[in-house]
Amino acid sequence: MIDTHCHIIYGVDDGSRSLEESMKMVEIYLANGFTKTIATSHFDRSRYMVDPDEIREKAAILNAEIAKRSMDFKIYPGHEIQVEPNTVKLINDGSLNKLADSRYVLLELPFMNKALFLKDLIFNIQLEGLVPIIAHAERYAYVKENPDYLLDFIKMGALIQVNYSSIVSSQRTTRTLLERNMVHFLGTDAHQSEWRSPNIKDEKREIIDIIGEDKFKILSQTNPQKILDDEYIGSGYDQIKEAKKKKRSIFDFWRKK
């Protein structure tokens, strides 16, 4: 499997605190069936503005240590980009890493309030020949309230990543997105070896129960590998299923009064 979202680069954000902590994460990754991950350290002006070169340098150090220990694992550089109106400029001037030097960029949205400029931003990102991926879409309050919020962006060609762990913490929304074919990638969003670790064995089983082995392979292997190979991934907008209609209650009539 390939992880598309993690904070394995040490000493730069709220993720791993040391090289050895990162190596413990690699051990957990391997025990869970992963062989590759994209390091998506934060770029967020309110918290962490991790330098793109530092991500690359520390990824290289970690990969050298991985090889030294004869582990079958590789780390690729990336960024988790908190959206702002001038995100495209920051990408173009080299302040932000694309995922594994591909056409794909991972975007983090505000958690509580909608980014009113998001549609324009996605359009402008696409004008640059890039493909936006919305990180942990299930965690945003407005997506929990209305998963259809994502439909316009998927129709534009944006892709959706959800966290394995959210099948527990945001179960209803995650299940809805998975069942309706609105997800393109699974990610651990792993931060450390114990707190928010890459250990997703239980979550993996639950997700497979929902979408089946074949679809799980697409979200955890096929599509992530296409990022690494810089291959096109369609949004599959026409494959999205209608929302299930809520069961009506005998009391609904009186509620409308």
Each language-model region and where it sits:
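An N-terminally biased module of ancient metal coordination in phosphate/nucleic-acid-related enzymes
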Residues: 1-71
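Extended substrate/RNA-proximal surfaces in nucleic-acid metabolism proteins
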Residues: 49-161, 239-257
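A general structural detector for well-ordered alpha-helical segments in enzyme core domains, enriched
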Residues: 21-25, 54-62, 121, 149-150, ...
